[in-house]
A protein has these predicted regions:
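Class I Rossmann-like S-adenosyl-L-methionine
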Residues: 1-179
Length: 179
């Protein structure tokens, strides 16, 4: 997690927040816990809530976004680039940010770290905007993409709760209440 390059990005900007969330996703993949990361990594305090929201949202939709990337990108990009795509695709799916602003800020985040990939990221995100309904329907054909849980967990729940496994998986992914 030492390799966070956000030095040219304004902390109040969405590009900084996408970049930080992507770095956290990569670190989780390397075995770090989010609790540990949020405690140890310096994040601009004003940006912290949005970085956390982006990170948690991306993790909740990891199966779907990874499925889309693996389906629509012939050569899988490097981990951090994939993580930026996951953050951006999740937000486009949830429709919580202005779509074109989100695409622009994701491309700025990529340009700050991996400028060679900005055209690819821009193309993937814009393609999603054009083909959103088709991508969402395609995700429903894959259990990991549909339920956003690993296949081993889906199989375990199917075996232990053959009549209730789908509701169990579905109730596990929404955001928690703000209480």
């Amino acid at each position: 997690i030492d390799k966070i390059f956000v030095h040219r990005l304004a902390p109040s900007g969405l590009a900084y927040q996408i970049s930080m969330a992507a770095h956290f996703l990569v670190a989780v993949g390397e075995g770090y816990s989010l609790q540990q990361l949020f405690a140890q990594v310096k994040i601009d305090e004003a940006a912290r809530p949005n970085v956390q929201r982006l990170t948690f949202d991306a993790l909740r939709h990891w199966g779907t976004t990874q499925f889309w990337i693996n389906t629509h990108v012939s050569n899988p990009p490097a981990e951090w680039i994939q993580a930026v795509l996951c953050v951006a695709l999740t937000q486009l799916l949830l429709r919580e940010e202005n779509e074109f602003t989100l695409v622009n800020e994701a491309v700025i985040a990529i340009d700050n770290n991996k400028p060679h990939a900005k055209g690819m990221v821009n193309a993937i995100l814009r393609r999603f905007l054009r083909e959103r309904d088709g991508w969402i329907a395609l995700a429903q054909t894959n259990e990991v993409a549909q339920f956003n849980h690993p296949q081993w967990w889906i199989d375990t729940l199917k075996a232990q709760y053959p009549n209730d496994w789908q509701p169990i998986l579905l109730v596990n992914n929404p955001r928690p209440p703000l209480t």
